[in-house]
Amino acid sequence: MLLFLILLLPVVLKFSFVSLSAPARWNCPEGSPSGNGNATCVGPAPFLIFSHGNSIFRIDLEGTNHEQLVADAGISVLMDFHYNEERIYWVDLERQLLQRVFLNGTRQEKVCNLEKNVSGMAINWINEELIWSNQQEGTITVTDMKGNNSRVLLSALKYPANVAVDPVERLMFWSSVVAGSLHRADVTGVEVRLLLETSEEIAAVSLDVLDKRLFWIQYNREGGSSRICSCDYDGGSVHFSKHLTQHNVFAMSLFGDHIFYSTWKKKTIWVANKHTGKDMVKMNLNPAFVPPGGIKVVHPLVQPKAEGDAWASDQKLCKLRKGNCRGSMCGQEPKSHVCTCAEGYTLSQDGRKCEDVNECAFWNHGCTLGCENTPGSYYCTCPAGFVLLPDGKRCHQLISCPSNVSECSHDCVLTSDGPICFCPEDSVLEADGKTCSGCSSPDNGGCSQLCLPLSPVTWECGCFPGYDLQLDKKSCRASGPPPFLLFANSQDIRHMHFDGTDYETLLNQQIGMVLALDHDPVENKVYFAHTALKWIERANMDGSQRERLFEEAVDVPEGLAIDWIGRKFYWTDRGRSLIEGSDLNGKYREIIIKEDISQPRGIAVHPVAKRLFWTDMGTNPRIESSSLQGIGRQVIASSDLVWPSGITIDYLTDKLYWCDAKQSVIEMSNLDGSRRQRLAQNDVGHPFAVAVFEDHVWFSDWTMPSVIRVNKRTGKNRVRLRGSMLKPSSLVVVHPLAKPGTNPCLHQNGGCEHICKESFGTAQCLCHEGFLKAPDGKMCLALNGQEILAGRGKDLSDGVMPVDTLPRSRELEDNLTESQHILVAEIMVSDDEDCGAAGCSAQARCVTEGEDATCQCLKGFAGDGNLCSDIDECELGTSVCPPTSSECINTEGGHVCRCSEGYQGDGIHCLDIDECQLGVHTCGENATCTNTEGNYTCTCAGRPSEPGRICPDPTPPSHLGEDGRYSVRNSYSECPPSHDGYCLHGGVCMYIEAVDSYACNCVFGYVGERCQHRDLKWWELRHAGLGRQWNVTVVAVCVVVLVLLLLLGLWGAHYYRTQKLLSKNPKNPYEESGRDVSGIRPADGEAGMSSCPQPWFVVIKEHQNLRNGSQPGAPKDGLGADVGQFSSLEPGSLQPTSWRKEPQMYMDTEQGCCIPSSSDKGSGPQGIGYSFHLPSYGARSIAVGVEKSHSLLSANPLRQQRAPDPPHQMELTQ
């Protein structure tokens, strides 16, 4: 909110006061005074008054503020109003009375008695007179506004009725019921003349006082049809509308370009175009038992002043003539120059100014403890610890009430009279004694925008710049052009004003199912997305210049939002579960949100706060927010949600609104999710999208296809707009102030020829000196009558007029209008309709034909009206899709055509793509491209034509390498230089000799003959494959790690066991003696035999006698033979050897131990050459030490007598 106020600061400084005027929002009738050159007129909003049964009601033209003004008015079918007096006058035919009441429904009183058979009544607001006709007496009578001084103006008339008067022109009109004629006379009763006669009945008469034309309803008794007719005040320029209505019109009233009329039997008020007569809006007044009677549009333009100034009332003249009467007010005699002071002021001694009365100084205020004077008033105050009671006078000590008895909206104080509710400062207690109202209360003092405290108990309402305070001094309305709704209706896009008028189709071609759209106020374009064709398009607001931004790149887009300041747009794709963004030209596309998102639907953007807001309808429904880049995500709401659908932002108050389609509710909160509040529930059907503007929230409903609006603070005052709708989806309000911060002058100079000046979001065109603004408000004309092109000085006055300025006949206008399909909107004050309480099917509409109403299925559906089913045009073969060039896709209520490859279209028609002319063929430079239906052919020199064939270069590519040899690379060679750039996106061009053609080897992510298409499917599969590959890799690594850990554990166990066994040191079982080694065993228990050292194991190998000059050699049978020799020995035995071999003792140990003789000079670790471990055969393990083994062998006498043995090489192992 702070950021928005900062943007509005220059505007606030420029308009440093709060406007208290009441400009309305409607198109200025031709000839009426307008505002500062814009499209609005300064004045209050018009509204209707009508009689209904024995009551009189009022209702806004938009269907809101439907109130009963008079409860017991009798049969009041004849009525009129006096705007300056703010009174309604009506004839009570039952009691034969003329009565009146104020426009707000107060002070009902009798004026005078009337005779029977009164057939018409009108008010002369300039002469202050009442005029009525008597059909039976044939007279027209006049009286003053108090019912005095009655006199007969005209007599001897033929059944006069339907009196109308234009006091400005001093003319009076009436019709003759029997004769079927129209008459005119002066308001004084002279100059009576017949204007025209007809054989048909004239049902009702009304005047267009601005265009100076007389309108009437001409009824054909035989055909039962009516038409709207008009003529000028002299009876000339008669115009008959071609459109016939089956309604029997009872009363009518004109305002602007519209006629409001009621019928004899239907409980509705119709709005029609006064030129064409076509019905535009049907205002359904159900529940009601009788049709409405008299009807009038109340607005000052309906009763202008004689001097031609429609706004110069006596009250305004008084304000202009007050002179030095400061602080004065206009009294009962506004034309006098006497100053009259308002309450709280007193006239000064010189009688020229009003001075404030200080009530607190005179002690006549009635305050018990404190008093504070203000200009024109005062208020009571209380010290700390006391509260002001609801009477505004007494103070009471603050004693809180028990919590169980307090039902106050703010707080409660316990007094001697019991508990009493009180309110905070700047608020007062309402009539119910419980609710507070004021600037500090939730109702904001009843103000729609700004609440400005004047004292602790008084305040006044104000409006933001660009908005105007209305006559109720509470509500604000946007200035500028009238706002309208733009919404998607499944098969088309429509727009309508808030009052149901100008209900038309913007894009009516078959565009599939369109659910998402938004409006760009800068370029005045509409952006929309297709769910069937999977496109995103944009177009002008008149339906022209359609541009396709994305094709086949979205799946189920259901939400779209425009950043009109940042010039980007964002959309949700429920099918792909992500949110994407792009610039407004479809470039720089990026994914904004793709993680932790399920089924996004609605989306809204706040350009000032630079935040995105969206709804998620998935398994975890919630409302979320993030930055425009997708970071800083925040959950706005997650509880009590089922199907959160549409979402929107009130940029003035920084409030967030959303709807839940499943729960049928509308909710609101602050932008951070705080102060969440439920506005409407159970009576909003199946809401899809929401929009907010001014004081109302709009939302679309699928249950009863329509758009509904409620008050944005209370959820009350519900009004439904419908009319041949199928599934109204996304909707936006189009107005310059709906999206603040817009500068339309930035785009094409706002459409202005010379100077464009931005004013509250609208482009104001100005002209340079010496030029005059043209009637279109944008072009400039030279003062000498010639139109000059700005900046060029070119004379364009060649006798050609712009089309918009050419005169157009009424007949031509009717023909143009007749050729267009006019939609009729219906304003439903309640949900009751003429087709019964059950209503029609959601795919049907209630059609009124004369006095009967029936349900009819909409186009594209079949049934009896109560049950309608979709017609599958594709299956029935009734589609418009050409089977040779397109595929028919059925949609609800229609179908679309998806063009085949080689064709392009708009969803209906498919046209052949001329690849040759567009340069998208693949023929190459050496061929001639010929376009064919849906394809093309390439004609190569000397070869037949084939579709899509690439002709090679006439000079065959050389395969000769630098070394003079022919090189072959997988039978493919590179393309010649003439094909440089043939393959796109990094593809490699190759010549395939086998087929004598060229081909592209595309990089990953691209497909096509020239790698021209991005393979999104491959991209998704690649990411899916990478994900699977990553999962497999992780599993494999985990398995390998587990196996390694298992092996490490086994090795550790083995190592531990080995060390444990080696650490044991058992005694040697053999005695160390000089006995013969053959069969001698040492005595048991004899010590002194040491075991083999643990780290050393030796094996004695045979070598040749080096002394004989022979080289050492391997054993005869190899190393394995030596092992085999030991295998047959018993543990502890000594093997006999030859003189060349030493005796070898085998002792069975875990690793084995071979003991050489002690005379071996190579004994010890230094002389070891080879080693091996002997196997174990289950005998007792004996570890023999090196030292002991030497002593053991030296004890053998045979060994000592032998000649020295050749040296043995020994190897140490560990």
From Swiss-Prot:
Disulfide bonds join C360-C371, C367-C380, C382-C395, C401-C412, C408-C421, C423-C436, C439-C451, C447-C461, C463-C476, C745-C756, C752-C765, C767-C780, C835-C846, C840-C855, C857-C868, C874-C888, C881-C897, C899-C910, C916-C929, C923-C938, C940-C951, C975-C989, C983-C1000, C1002-C1011. EGF stimulates the growth of various epidermal and epithelial tissues in vivo and in vitro and of some fibroblasts in cell culture. Magnesiotropic hormone that stimulates magnesium reabsorption in the renal distal convoluted tubule via engagement of EGFR and activation of the magnesium channel TRPM6. LDL-receptor class B repeats lie at residues 86-127, 128-169, 170-211, 212-258, 483-523, 524-566, 567-609, 610-653, 654-696. This is Pro-epidermal growth factor. It is a single-pass type I membrane protein. InterPro entries: 6-blade_b-propeller_TolB-like, cEGF, Cueball_EGF_LRP_Nidogen, EGF-like_Ca-bd_dom, EGF-like_dom, EGF-type_Asp/Asn_hydroxyl_site, EGF_Ca-bd_CS, Growth_fac_rcpt_cys_sf. It comes from Sus scrofa (Pig). Residues 314-355, 356-396, 397-437, 435-477, 741-781, 832-869, 870-911, 912-952, 971-1012 form the EGF-like domain. GO terms for cellular component: plasma membrane. One of its GO terms (biological process) is epidermal growth factor receptor signaling pathway. GO terms for molecular function: calcium ion binding; growth factor activity. Its main location: membrane. Residues 1052-1214 are cytoplasmic. The lineage of its organism: Eukaryota, Metazoa, Chordata, Craniata, Vertebrata. SMART domains: EGF, EGF_CA, LY. Pfam families: cEGF, EGF_CA, FXa_inhibition, Ldl_recept_b. It is found in: Membrane. Residues 1193-1214 are annotated as: Disordered. The gene is EGF. Residues 1-22 form the signal peptide.
